[in-house]
Amino acid sequence: MSRSRQIAPSGTSQVESVPQQPNNTSTVRVPGTLRLRAENEPTVESNTEGRGLHRHIRWSEDVIDNEGMGKRSSKVCCIYHKARPVGESSSESESSDSESSDADSDNEIDNPRNTLGRSSVHHITDNHSHEQESEHDRERGRLTCCPNHGHRKLKRRRPSPNAYEKMPKTTKGR
């Protein structure tokens, strides 16, 4: 059986089935034509350029609502995490030590594990220049200044919970 596929300029496709000559001539096949057409043409809506096509999603009755919320959605069910530079912590707390907990965060100035390489090196030497510290590091609360100089450590804000940790808001009337 041979098949040919043609795409018409109107956006429809056509598939033809042509029978081959079988060895047994008692079977007769009738060639058929299958024509596919869009149910509705896309509506043209004006956007900033005036040329855009706007398509709507129409859910059929057999679509399964897999989240049990009574909503049908075309969104992917996952959380996107922005890419981070190499060497930057992947946790929300920006801590380089995975063993630290919230109880330890009160004593972070005295904790030598929370100092970065450059800022801990100048504890040993007499060179007390803080020019190497970037403004970005100071804003993000990454640097711990020397306790000997009277510098204050910047407070870190508590990490906000991610979408899996948040409890959904409920209305009390239901």
From Swiss-Prot:
Residues 1-28 have a biased composition (Polar residues). It is found in: Nucleus. The keyword Nucleus applies. Residues 94-109 have a biased composition (Acidic residues). Keywords: Nucleus. Residues 123-142 have a biased composition (Basic and acidic residues). Residues 1-72, 84-174 are annotated as: Disordered. GO terms for cellular component: nucleus. Its main location: nucleus. Residues 149-159 have a biased composition (Basic residues). GO terms for molecular function: protein phosphatase 1 binding; protein serine/threonine phosphatase inhibitor activity. Belongs to the YPI1 family. Regulator of type 1 phosphatases which maintains protein phosphatase activity under strict control. This is Type 1 phosphatases regulator ypi1. It comes from Aspergillus oryzae (strain ATCC 42149 / RIB 40) (Yellow koji mold).
